[in-house]
Amino acid sequence: MALPILLDCDPGHDDAIAIVLALASPELDVKAITSSAGNQTPEKTLRNVLRMLTLLNRTDIPVAGGAVKPLMRELIIADNVHGESGLDGPALPEPTFAPQNCTAVELMAKTLRESAEPVTIVSTGPQTNVALLLNSHPELHSKIARIVIMGGAMGLGNWTPAAEFNIYVDPEAAEIVFQSGIPVVMAGLDVTHKAQIHIEDTERFRAIGNPVSTIVAELLDFFLEYHKDEKWGFVGAPLHDPCTIAWLLKPELFTTVERWVGVETQGKYTQGMTVVDYYYLTGNKPNATVMVDVDRQGFVDLLADRLKFYA
């Protein structure tokens, strides 16, 4: 039986590819998609969800827009990474359908309430919508199987020296998620920076030759440009968000550890840092499954295999 999931995202090139991977996978039943502000403004990320679902001919999936800003902060966006539209590069279709007449939290709550079994929430942007759901609907916590997030790092940040972008945008929301008591799976930079797509991988996707694989290759062409900066030391572009979906499909591709994670919300230099108690120094019980390594080739092969679904 397919695993029911709710996808909360802020497309974003890697979010878009996570959507492509999820909807090409019969093991997953995507119940709804909600958008968060992050990689671009809330209006643009919502539009990008609708554009991707129009491309994939999945306008049957309910969509709703989420919070327009973080819980306690002003919004920061990553337009230097994702471009003016949030999905610069390919020519994507205009949306042929409209979002639901409700908020992201309302759609999430309705989906959980109506599900016969607990639902996995996959969150690949800032955690604002998920935190609002947890705070406003404690009665629905038991309907959440787990929360799989792309965010954080055990070491180096990618937005500040200490913080990864998604967590930095709304650290208060991320702290609510980690301390919720619901199982959390964290795909942080430790693993996503190893999930790099090289130029030859992009050409492999392009050669599959269907409209979706071509769009994915064009998304990667644009995404690679930012990551060519030699400061990163990358060979390709790290495909952060699809690691969440890939872990659900093939957990054997990933090495994980069980650890306690907290989020720094106050620090002078470390706001947005995920503090991972790797050596069990706090005495706190682990609250997260933390991905630390990935079989890169297996990850690329999975993407290539699933892109053939769209032939």
From Swiss-Prot:
One term of GO molecular function: purine nucleosidase activity
Signal peptide: none
Pfam families: IU_nuc_hydro
Record-annotated active site: H240
Any GO BP annotation: pyrimidine nucleobase metabolic process
One Gene Ontology term, aspect cellular component: cytosol
Keyword Hydrolase (UniProt): yes
Enzyme Commission code: 3.2.-.-
Keywords associated with the record: Glycosidase, Hydrolase
Family designation: Belongs to the IUNH family. RihA subfamily.
HAMAP family per the UniProt record, alphabetical: Pyrim_hydro_RihA
Functional summary from the UniProt entry: Hydrolyzes cytidine or uridine to ribose and cytosine or uracil, respectively.
Protein name: Pyrimidine-specific ribonucleoside hydrolase RihA
UniProt source species: Shigella boydii serotype 18 (strain CDC 3083-94 / BS512)
Organism taxonomic ancestry: Bacteria, Pseudomonadati, Pseudomonadota, Gammaproteobacteria, Enterobacterales
